[in-house]
A protein has these predicted regions:
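NTP/phosphate- and nucleic-acid-binding module
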Residues: 1-483
């Protein structure tokens, strides 16, 4: 590379920063010649696999089992739950031919898999002893996206996890919804450092076929909102459509209660890249970094052999401790090496001090150097990995908290909407009777009602009025401009 630094101002031009980092850090190639479909290169795919590993482990520790269902869904299945299919009809990719033969019935590439799972659940579930049933699959889904596509944020094929859970009672189903939120907190916030707010979505913006939808929104550097996970209480809507029933202890057949959960693995990676990155490139949580440490020897001609041998000793010590390590023995200049590995988000170790038996470590998050004795290199690197995550999480929380505003009138909302972020306002209702007010905000200001926060939910005072229609305010809602 001819440039010595990545050097794109993320704060001033996030769109350019994002488009360049995914290409120059070799995360994504979007030149594949089908709109909305991208090539995941090794650096991004390695991170995606790490996120999948963490998320799948969290699900399985809570009783979920992995499965894999077919990519295609028969048209008859898709049309069994009317509200559900209406929500996805315009986004479905249809298979109409097998070779030169037209199929008798069309097959859908899964836009989501409720209608693939639930016919099988109707066969598998017979009695109370079959419940609860908690299954998940890690897969790609396909949606004929008509909005502008953006790699890792909005595409026609994207990666996620979907969990489909079945219970005997409504109470158990709602407990699962709460557990889904806990998993998101553990993985996305605690282990990846991305803060978010879980909202109850307005009825007009819920998952089609659900009774209620709860979704996690984070804030991107440009102040736009990105949904990164959602969980849905389905009630008995799908169990009645697909006749999923069990025999209770009294010998009565009853419809089950269901939930579904969709962590957006693609979008979680987009959030990690965007929120933690800086003007010099990627800054990654230690746990998902493809390379956790790079050893960069900077020898003179006279010390080349001894410095490189010392570097290999450092590499061996770190690898034997289970860390992902590389050494850069290339002929690039020191500046070119530092530029490349900094852009890729990798902390550096420079074994310059052979005689003193210590190494210099460069922290990618703070861009500061610290020294460590060779015998303590493993302990020091692991400790720094924890500190990097804590620092990234703290920085991200500070940013999000600084981007939450309050308004009591449309004039204030209009002014604040230029800043991005969340705007808290008194609002009439998140039921269908509030839909027209929500549509007006979208039409006039490009703002969406994201919903009511599930933590610290506060009811407006008696005299509070909806900023749009002037009726009595039933809720404080968060507004935002979304991807």
């Amino acid at each position: 590379m001819s440039k010595e630094t990545f050097n794109v101002d993320k704060e001033k031009n996030f769109s350019e920063w994002f488009n360049r980092i995914i290409r120059e850090a070799q995360l994504i190639d979007d030149r594949y010649n089908v709109k909305g479909f991208i090539v995941h290169r090794p650096w991004s795919m390695t991170m995606l696999k790490q996120i999948y590993r963490i998320y799948e482990d969290a699900l399985e520790r809570r009783g979920h089992k992995p499965v894999l269902f077919p990519t295609v869904i028969p048209e008859d299945n898709l049309y069994k739950e009317e509200e559900h299919v209406e929500g996805f009809r315009a986004e479905v990719f249809w298979i109409t031919h097998g070779g030169d033969d037209r199929l008798d019935k069309r097959l859908a590439l899964r836009p989501t898999s409720e209608t693939a799972f639930y016919p099988m659940y109707a066969l598998w579930i017979r009695s109370i002893s079959d419940l609860p049933l908690k299954l998940y699959q890690s897969c790609s889904v396909f949606r004929y996206e008509t909005k502008a596509t953006k790699p890792l944020i909005r595409g026609r094929e994207f990666l996620w996890i979907e969990a489909h859970d079945v219970f005997a009672t409504e109470e158990d189903a709602y407990r699962q919804v709460e557990e889904d939120m806990e998993v998101a907190e553990e993985v996305i916030h605690k282990r990846l450092g991305v803060p978010f707010i879980f909202f109850e979505r307005p009825q007009w913006d819920k998952f089609k076929g659900a009774v209620k939808t709860f979704a996690a929104d984070c804030l991107m550097p440009d102040g736009r909102v990105l949904q990164i996970a959602s969980t849905h209480y389905l009630g008995q809507n799908f169990s009645k459509a697909f006749e999923i029933m069990y025999l209770d202890s009294d010998g009565k057949r009853k419809h089950v209660y269901q939930t579904c959960y969709g962590p957006g693995i693609w979008r979680i990676l987009a959030a990690v890249i965007s929120i933690h990155g800086d003007n010099n490139g990627l800054v990654l949580p230690f746990e998902i970094a493809p390379v956790q440490v790079v050893v960069v020897p900077i020898p003179t001609k006279e010390t080349k052999d001894v410095v490189e041998e010392y570097s290999r000793t450092v590499v061996d010590m770190l690898r034997s401790a289970g860390l992902r390590v590389e050494a850069d023995f290339s002929d690039k200049t020191p500046g070119a090496k530092y530029y490349y590995w900094e852009m890729m988000g990798v902390p550096e170790v420079g074994p310059r001090e052979v005689e003193g038996k210590y190494v210099t470590l460069f922290r990618r998050d703070t861009r500061k150097r610290v020294k460590a004795p060779l015998e303590k290199i493993v302990e020091t690197v692991k400790k720094l990995g924890d500190e990097i995550l804590e620092n990234l999480r703290r920085r991200a929380e500070k940013f999000m908290n600084s981007m939450v505003f309050r308004a009591e009138s449309m004039e204030e909302v209009r002014r604040l909407s230029e800043k991005g972020g969340f705007i808290i306002v008194p609002f009439c209702s998140i039921g269908y009777d509030g839909e027209e007010c929500g549509l007006r905000l979208k039409r006039e200001l490009g703002l969406e009602v994201r919903g009511v926060p599930l933590k610290n939910r506060v009811k407006p005072p008696e005299d509070a009025r909806c900023i749009v229609c002037g009726r009595k305010a039933g809720e404080y809602v968060y507004l935002g401009k979304a991807y």
